[in-house]
Amino acid sequence: MCGIAGFVHLDGRPLTRGNDDLVLGAMGDAMGHRGPDDTQLMLWQNVGFVFKRLSIVDIDGGRQPIETPDGRISAMVNGEIYNHREIRAALGGRYALRTQSDSEVIPFLYLERELGLFEPANGMFAVALLDRQQRRLLLGRDRAGVKPLLYHLSDDGKLLVFASELKALFAHPAVPRVFDWQSAFVDWLVPDVVPRELPSGFRGIRHVPAASILDVSLIDGGCRVSTYWQVPAREQGAPVAPVSSYVERYGELLADSVRLRLMSDVPYGVFLSGGVDSAVVTALAARAGPLPTFTVLSRSTVGSGDAEAARDVAAGLGLPNHQVLFDEENLGLTPDGWRRILYSCEMFPVGPEQLFKFHLHEFAKQRYPGLKVILLGQGSDEWTGGYLSRTLGEQDAWAPSDWGRLGERLQSTATARAARLAGLSDSDADLVHFGVLDRSCIPGAVRPGTAPHTWELYAGHWRQNLDYHLWHEDRTAAAHGVESRVPFLDYRILELLATIPEQHHAELFVDKQILRRAAAGLLPARIAQRRKVYFYHGRQEHHAYRMMYSILAANRGELIDQAIAGSMRTGGPLVPDRFRTFFQDVGRFPSVRQIARLLQLVNMGVLADLAASQWTCRPGSSPPPMREVVFDDWMLSPAGRRALRQSASTRPPDDMVVGFAPGVSLVEVKAGGLGVPALGSTFLVREEGILTSAIESRTWSQFLARLDGRRTLGEILAWLGLDREQILQPLGAALDDGVLVDVEDARQGAAA
């Protein structure tokens, strides 16, 4: 991983020393975390490059920009060309390659193939290449869009600026630093309408698309985007192989992908969550030798079983497992600390998961200062059916028969979310109706895309989110001088998955069965077949979001004030007095959905303010260093025992009698307050008058109304005709908060 940036005067005006080189230097400084090992500037006529290097391959010889011996081509590469040795062999002796750097093959591939230069490359990369002879600049990205590359083209067409991060773009004085509220609201309200381009969040700034090249003429200033790769479609009439052959080929490609991504002259590690994705990556990587693994240990990962599974996977492979303790109630994150994370991530959809990933990278770097590469399990869910439970609802197991209703649910979800932009239904409409948001800042309706069959709908639905995940993973790692690598996004794997016959989809793409079957020889069955769980979702989600609310409320709502200031400075929709009231009401009537909505709006406003304030962020105070603990020892501590109790009650038995805790009752609150959801007006209230949780679901409200301290959970659900999954999350949260209790346990406790 490195940082690349530069600009070109498309009107032909030459760059000057003492001016433009200073701008290039500032752009490099803005992304210095991406490349702390070396800095290089290049000025040629009307083109300027700046390169920040993180040395991973060919430590001594890999300096960039890379030039051909005759000086015709200069290139900068952020990322890795994993198969560079094979490419070198294919080039034969036609060129004099002088280093062992993987990036050196790029200019010579251009000499051979011009716009086809990336076709032989297997890697993750963002490239800027200057051809002095043809007076041409190319900006290109890898097939999956793992490595970032953004650009700004001035309205008059005279200036093009590009960079790996927004921070570097904003260091150029001609690049606008204006938050794009319109595109943000499209993304916020309609996150999975397809197809769409991933927005940068700022006006006049776009991404070079994945698998594409921006071809810039230095003669006439013309800019043209061409695509060099697309996810292939299965050919009509192609032979259909048995399911086992696709599983076998998938396993072979994944093993080779991990092997390639161990290409490094510096130490590397792996983030081991405990799920099958990262467990498979860890097992395959361990074939090459020992490596450290890092795991989040929290109330959530204990409750989900992830922390224990990660410990067992590492122990079974003989690898060190660093369980890093995150205490949501005592993390100590300040507004400055949250600002630092937003500044690093550069986007508003940032929440608890990014917070913990950010600090897990921080811990890994502190624990192993020489570590520069982390392997991740990212990208598997989006391509192998890992998000079915979010799409169809939670259940214990999935069967091929569930495939039929997947397409219907996906299409109806996309249509409904698109319609929200026209009418702003439910609680989003409340924010407009009660004056929290200015309706004029919210865009009109959009129509969802369509896809011919179920798998394309699923893939399009979730690959939109993958773009964000890749952005998050790149930024949270880069902030600490670390490169993240994603074996599941090897283009050969994507091509295989895209061409599996439709008649095999239900068998292979339900709950990642193709991966689970491929993992059978690598992992114990209990790990390979572990049910998908989400990082900070489910019943533990409310703890994480209440932590986020405490950050927003810190220093008398410092971040709230900054968000309002950012909105006012940039013509945003936040109405100051109403927004402060909304913030206060959410504190009185807390719920995950309300806090999440508040957090995203605050993130938008803070980013708008940071950009308008020259995009700087003071270092501020960070949380105390993350603490590593031994899993078994921590589980014997009071905090561990508490987490274990919560874990044991994750799925309360049908014969449990649930009742209200002493002093807790249901009350009706008149609908219409800013913090009151449009749907629900019922609240659980403690006797001291504190509204502990808003009831946003009629199903949950009906369940609570039937609690009498005598009937069992199963009896109440049967009476109402409900499934346990429909109330599992709020029930778990209420039991954790102590507003509901197991009546029998409460009686035994009182007797004791």
Task: Give residue spans per PLM region.
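Short beta-strand "wing" residues that participate in macromolecule-binding interfaces
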Residues: 278, 484, 529, 741-743
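Short, Lys/Arg-rich nucleic-acid/phosphate-binding segment
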Residues: 745-748
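Cysteine-centered catalytic environments shared across enzyme families
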Residues: 1-329, 337-340, 344-345, 372, ...
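Extended catalytic-interface subdomain
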Residues: 376-379
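Short amphipathic alpha-helical interaction segments
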Residues: 722-733
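Adenosyl-5′-phosphate
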Residues: 1-4, 8, 116, 170, ...
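ATP-dependent adenylate-handling ligase core
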Residues: 299-364, 368, 385, 389-400, ...
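A catalytic-pocket lid/entrance helix-loop region that shapes and gates access to the active site
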Residues: 382-423
